[in-house]
Amino acid sequence: MQKKLLEIIVCPFCYTRLFMNDTETELICNIENISFPLKQGIPVLLKNQIRYLNCKIIDNQ
């Protein structure tokens, strides 16, 4: 995926910046805890393509 596109693309739900995962196969929204797949370098920002991410809750006690 082109770096310029990554700088301007946002989550279609909360409008925050998306980040590439380590394997460069998904775009991640840290606010919504979801990811969107990349198909041949093209982001698929459709609701039916979302993958919900597991989030860890840290207990400070």
Swiss-Prot record:
The lineage of its organism: Bacteria, Pseudomonadati, Pseudomonadota, Gammaproteobacteria, Enterobacterales. Belongs to the UPF0434 family. Gene3D superfamilies: 2.20.25.10. This is UPF0434 protein Bfl377. It comes from Blochmanniella floridana.
